[in-house]
């Protein structure tokens, strides 16, 4: 797979936030294996740095654990190996493609899994991405479809993530979101109405990063064009930005 498909590189403070798509490649789940549906939520509350600090304090058993903290440090590290990719990029690529993990990657997965806790509040998380999630759902080129066609195809789809996924609870701190320093190249904007049961850990504080667990349930509730444009690195022209609203639990 070309390097660009494993996510962007050079994100300051958390290269895990630069991942563009494979971390959220979703697999539709149908029939008897389908997860339970999200509960009905009337209000989603904004998440703050204070909320994050309080949740960390309430889960000191995890956040004081040296193995979890070492795995978390590796996950958000900018350091790359001989392949040119970070620890998290390689881990997520292998998880998405069902490849064997090396000892270091298995340690990361085990320790991150041990540190996962429910976010505890019905809140909204934000993510900027490329169109990998659409391609995983059978849409080869969303720019050739109307908004109505996309809604008919996608709304109501329930799926599960196959790897870890980075979000921001404060969109002003995510450099890849629209309007931010590196936001011009991401054509898919995902708004996640995360229910309190969504399991996660905190990544880079400077980017208000929340990393959700492998196997997180997602259900698409809305799809629309927001009237803005992006210029992805792998495209030769600007394309309309699409917003996908999901619920997670």
Describe the residue ranges of each PLM region.
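Mono-ADP-ribosyltransferase
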Residues: 39-249
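Juxtamembrane/interface and other helix-to-disorder boundary residues
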Residues: 1-43
């Amino acid at each position: 797979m070309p390097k660009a498909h494993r996510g962007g590189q050079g994100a300051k403070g958390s290269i895990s936030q630069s991942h563009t798509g494979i971390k959220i490649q979703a697999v539709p789940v149908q029939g008897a294996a389908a997860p339970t549906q999200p509960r009905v939520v009337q209000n989603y509350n904004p998440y703050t740095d204070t909320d994050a600090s309080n949740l960390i304090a309430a889960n000191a058993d995890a956040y004081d654990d040296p193995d979890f903290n070492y795995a978390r440090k590796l996950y958000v590290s900018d350091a790359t190996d001989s392949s040119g990719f970070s620890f998290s990029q390689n881990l997520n690529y292998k998880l998405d493609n069902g490849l064997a993990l090396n000892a270091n990657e298995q340690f990361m997965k085990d320790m991150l899994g041990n540190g996962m806790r429910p976010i505890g509040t019905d809140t909204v998380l934000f993510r900027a991405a490329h169109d990998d999630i659409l391609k995983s759902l059978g849409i080869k080129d969303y720019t050739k479809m109307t908004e109505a066609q996309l809604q008919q195809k996608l709304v109501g789809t329930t799926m599960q993530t196959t790897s870890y996924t980075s979000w921001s609870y404060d969109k002003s701190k995510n450099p890849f979101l629209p309007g931010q320093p590196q936001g011009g190249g991401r054509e898919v904007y995902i708004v996640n109405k995360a229910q309190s049961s969504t399991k996660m850990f905190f990544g880079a504080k400077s980017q208000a990063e929340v990393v959700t667990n492998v196997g997180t349930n997602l259900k698409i509730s809305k799809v629309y064009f927001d009237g803005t444009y992006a210029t992805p690195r792998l495209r030769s022209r600007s394309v309309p930005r699409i917003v996908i609203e999901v619920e997670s639990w």
